[in-house]
């Protein structure tokens, strides 16, 4: 028993002027919003990642590599000082 779902065919949607008017505005706005989200630094604040100039401090220039598997808390405290 086959039938139709009552939805518009995709070809009708893509060829309509209304579709292109709406999407010619919304798609570029998504790219602009993403660019602003990253370029203003809000992405770093929202996800808690360090900014590129905060990975290394003036006192610590080496990579924070953990060596001891079972003494991680102690090593993390040393790296954070």
From Swiss-Prot:
UniProt-listed Pfam families: Cytochrom_B559 (PF00283), Cytochrom_B559a (PF00284)
Signal peptide interval: none
Sequence intervals crossing the membrane: 19-40
Gene Ontology terms: cellular component: photosystem II reaction center; plasma membrane-derived thylakoid membrane; plasma membrane-derived thylakoid photosystem II
Role according to the record: This b-type cytochrome is tightly associated with the reaction center of photosystem II (PSII). PSII is a light-driven water:plastoquinone oxidoreductase that uses light energy to abstract electrons from H(2)O, generating O(2) and a proton gradient subsequently used for ATP formation. It consists of a core antenna complex that captures photons, and an electron transfer chain that converts photonic excitation into a charge separation.
Protein family per UniProt: Belongs to the PsbE/PsbF family.
Name of the protein in its database record: Cytochrome b559 subunit alpha
Provenance organism: Synechocystis sp. (strain ATCC 27184 / PCC 6803 / Kazusa)
